[in-house]
Amino acid sequence: MIEQARIEELRQKLNQYSYEYYVQDQPTVPDSTYDQLLRELTELETAHPELITPDSPTQRVGAAALDAFEKVTHDLPMLSLGNVFDETEIREWVARIERSLGRSTTYVAELKFDGLAISLKYEDGQLVRGATRGDGTVGENITQNLRTIKALPLRLRRNETVEVRGEAYMPKQSFERLNADRAAREEALFANPRNAAAGSLRQLDSSITASRNLSLFVYGVGVNTLSARSHSEAMLQLAELGLPTNKEMQTCETVEEILAYIAHWTMERSNLPYEIDGIVLKVDRYDDQEELGFTAKSPRFATAYKFAAEEVMTTVEEVDFSVGRTGKVTPRARFAPVVVAGSTVSYATLHNADFITEKDIRLHDQVIIKKAGDVIPAVVSVVVSERTGNEQPIEFPAHCPACESELVRLEGEADIRCVSPECPAQLVEGIIHFVSRQAMNIDGLGEKVVRQLYEHEAIRTLADLYRLDRDELLTYERMGETSVDNLLTAIEASKQNSLERLMFGLGIRLVGQKAAYLLAERFDSLDGIAQAEYEDILAIDGIGSKIADSVTKYFEHPEAQALIKDLAELGLNQQFLGQRVDQSNAPLAGKTIVLTGTLESLKRSEAGKRLELLGADVTGSVSKKTDILVAGEKAGSKLTKAESLGIEIWNETQLLEELAKYEG
């Protein structure tokens, strides 16, 4: 059959061109040629669906969206690695290896990719399963999403049966493009490529994953079915099979060679097209690995050196103050621009007056800054030895920088606030919060549009959003008929939201999404919440005294009462419709979770809120009732106690994986 022969020829050509482009980084044909051949193959397979095979290049995307990921038990556990943090610990690790073996040995040094660990299983050369690491023993089947990664061969170059381990990641360029697209749509940005990769691979719709331009590297075998007698030999064999391996791997005979490799990539990491967060060190020979064995959690023959956060010195040139939606006044330092962890930094938050006092930060000081988690700029310390005598204390304003009202510091709080109900900065930030996806979810009404409407005096309160005039909007810059009609349609649709969205959107201090849901569920209507006594609110499981106090005080204000009445007259639903998933059916319902230590990618408070939205009960102390402890850096006594009680422990990577899995 002529068509069958042509289809097979096209598949072979396309697979070879993909290998040259995505694995070898040496394309031999232009993109247009590849696209033309792929189009021809698609047309032939459409005409002859009986000839479609799972490893065809056309089958990377297109399966129906899943309802959930099935669980997968790894043939061999995917253990985590121990850590070393400096030269002394590296030397001690090498010495310990050689003492155990009674001789010197050869090591392999590899880049530690900052992505999501995966397992890939091939049978007779064909990809049959791809899974996440999960807890190391049980992961999730994400084969459908991994198939969309063009660097991943759907069929090996030989009919081998093998399980390999690797890391799926998002290249820096793809990450920047993704965030630029999200910013243009006024969607929340991903904090870093690792989070973006994890979230992309946990999409139930593989077409979304395909649009994210992920890639991957294979870094080892699981159950070893190869003839290789060492890790470095195995990597050569995997490359021969067409799998994407990393060319920067290096064998090392001495600790000095290991240290030189680390020093080189510490300096050069920012020049790579993908993120790395350290170096993996392994004993090369498999018989040596077998002799060294494992601890309960990790192999003795391998460890990971994690890069320290890059720190740079710069000058505090000025400090400005911004006002948030709750009136909190936040100081922000502006620096002489410096490059930190690959990008230019020119400012960082100084949090509050206590932070400034504690670190004794002054205008014109030389300060050390870093990026927390290689993402968020942060001031580490002041270089006191560089002071010249020209430094000046940072003075908090006595009056609001937005409305000139007198600022206050409430008892027991570190923050200084503007309490004026007429403060324009609070009004704008409050409206931005009100229309956000987590609150009223009004599509097309992002921060820029809100500020534009405020500048035109079209809105001054939340209620004004529902009085916007179509003809007037059409006179504004970048407001065409289609965008205006879509905006007004979205605003009108938001009137039907369930009460918990409105309650969260009001921006009451300390009332997050979970508290808003609990209040709406308990009192059924906005009037019910507004008239509730402090004791009634406090009686709700999950609502503390500070939230109860904040809610009752909010509804005592005449301005709040007038707003509620206004919104009701404009037709906004103020009843609980039960539209959100019952927390009892949430993925982490019934789980008691404690967070301890320092998290690099997000604050513990943010992590706690996100876990609560997934149904977890987040508490502050470890007990027999605790199900999971999330342990960040420098976790102390809570970690020790959790280990003694046999409680499940997540590191930060596992936390991010779980959040990405359920948040999509």
UniProtKB/Swiss-Prot annotation:
Domain of life: Bacteria
Catalytic function, reaction form: NAD(+) + (deoxyribonucleotide)n-3'-hydroxyl + 5'-phospho-(deoxyribonucleotide)m = (deoxyribonucleotide)n+m + AMP + beta-nicotinamide D-nucleotide
Any one GO cellular component localisation term in the record: cytosol
Domain BRCT positions: 583-664
Residues annotated for Zn(2+) binding in this entry: 400, 403, 418, 423
Gene3D superfamilies associated with the record: 5' to 3' exonuclease, C-terminal subdomain (1.10.150.20), 6.20.10.30, BRCT domain (3.40.50.10190), DNA ligase/mRNA capping enzyme (3.30.470.30), Helix hairpin bin (1.10.287.610), Nucleic acid-binding proteins (2.40.50.140)
List of catalytic residues: 112 (n6-amp-lysine intermediate)
EC number: 6.5.1.2
CDD domains noted in UniProt: BRCT_DNA_ligase_like, LIGANc
PANTHER family (UniProt xref): CHROMOSOME TRANSMISSION FIDELITY FACTOR 18 (PTHR23389), DNA LIGASE (PTHR23389:SF9)
Identification of the protein by name: DNA ligase
Native source organism of the sequence: Exiguobacterium sibiricum (strain DSM 17290 / CCUG 55495 / CIP 109462 / JCM 13490 / 255-15)
Phylogenetic classification of the source organism: Bacteria, Bacillati, Bacillota, Bacilli, Bacillales
